[in-house]
Amino acid sequence: MARVTSVTLGEHLTGFVGEMIQSGRYGNISEVLRDALRLMEAREQRVQHVRDMVLAGTNAPVSHRLMDEIFSAAVKDTSV
């Protein structure tokens, strides 16, 4: 369910939002903010995934895999 929320933006962000709307990429401020929040949510999920991987590695026994193999797997796991 949609909810009306008031947001105060500084001059820089207000200008940026205006540019995005003027470019035609977005129709209004709400579209800009929703897209920005979706991107932020996705980034936070990736950060949490990396944190979980670090914690798992910290708690795991010693690995016999080469560092290159571990790094390649980590890059593959964090790719979106």
Curated annotation (Swiss-Prot):
Gene Ontology terms: biological process: regulation of DNA-templated transcription
Bridged cysteine pairs (disulfide): none
Source superkingdom: Bacteria
Protein name: Antitoxin ParD
PANTHER family referenced in this protein's UniProt entry, alphabetically: ANTITOXIN PARD (PTHR36582:SF2)
Function according to Swiss-Prot or TrEMBL: Antitoxin component of a type II toxin-antitoxin (TA) system. Neutralizes the effect of toxin ParE.
Pfam name, any one: ParD_antitoxin
Similarity remark: Belongs to the ParD antitoxin family.
Signal peptide: none
Alphabetical UniProt keywords: Plasmid, Toxin-antitoxin system
UniProt-listed InterPro entries: ParD, ParD_sf, Ribbon_hlx_hlx
